[in-house]
Design a protein with these regions (language model features):
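Domain-scale signature associated with acetyltransferase and cell-envelope carbohydrate enzymes
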Residues: 1-117, 142-144, 151, 161, ...
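Short, flexible, glycine/charge-rich loop motifs used to bind or transfer phosphoryl groups or to couple energy/partner
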Residues: 56-57, 79, 135-136, 170-171
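Short coil-to-beta-strand initiation/turn motif
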Residues: 72, 153, 169-171
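Short acidic/His/Gly/Ser-rich catalytic and metal-binding motifs that mark active-site loops
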Residues: 118-126
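Short, highly charged low-complexity linear segments
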Residues: 126-129, 172-173
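C-terminal segments of enzyme domains that contribute to small-molecule binding surfaces
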Residues: 128-155, 179-180
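C-terminal/domain-terminus segments
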Residues: 158-182
């Protein structure tokens, strides 16, 4: 007989939006808790007042075990794509905003209070031709990447495999070298 599996586990205060509009695709064997949303991993977060937000109107691919910590906001806009590699972990109170494409490789560890966004969240319009001067740009974060607390990853960034991003960093350019600490 086939056992019932619960691939998604939800912890604490979680707001889920766009359930019928968005797509969640598991590109891995389904096991219980392969995706954990709102899990408390930081003792200093207030478990009574810290809400996790899951707002996926686009497509989110999960390639293996993934954990979205307490107080995080995951937002994938309509027609946008976010990909989480195997063993993805964001600890808490971080914001992942995707309007086009954000890709995380395998074994990514993201600390708390991060902001990762592929957009400026506003448009700058050319006065000469009416075109958008600041379009969204994809973000690609390689495998075995560790991003320290209170860091900011901006649109258009590519981070190679095996990189450590130090706490309080702002990454606005590509990190092409492997095995570096930024």
């Amino acid at each position: 007989s086939k056992a019932i599996r619960f691939p998604i586990l939800i912890f604490g205060k979680v707001t889920i939006k766009n359930v019928r509009k968005g797509r969640l695709v598991f590109n891995c064997p389904l096991t219980t808790g392969i995706l954990q949303i709102g899990k408390r991993s930081l003792g200093f977060l207030d478990k009574h007042n810290c809400r996790t937000i899951w707002n996926v109107a686009g497509t989110l691919y999960v390639h293996g075990k993934a954990s979205i910590g307490q107080g995080c906001c995951v937002e994938v806009e309509k027609d946008a794509v976010m990909t989480l590699g195997r063993n993805f972990n964001v600890t808490g109170r971080s914001v992942l905003l995707c309007t086009e494409q954000i890709t995380f490789g395998d074994d990514c560890l993201l600390s708390w209070d991060l902001l990762i966004m592929d957009t400026d969240w506003h448009k700058v319009i050319s006065t000469t031709d009416g075109g958008i001067l600041n379009p969204s740009k994809p973000i690609n974060i390689g495998s075995h990447v560790w991003i320290g607390c209170r860091s900011l990853i901006l649109k258009g960034v590519n981070i190679s495999d095996n990189v450590i991003v130090a706490a309080n960093s702002t990454i606005s350019r590509n990190i092409d070298e492997e095995f570096v600490v930024v």
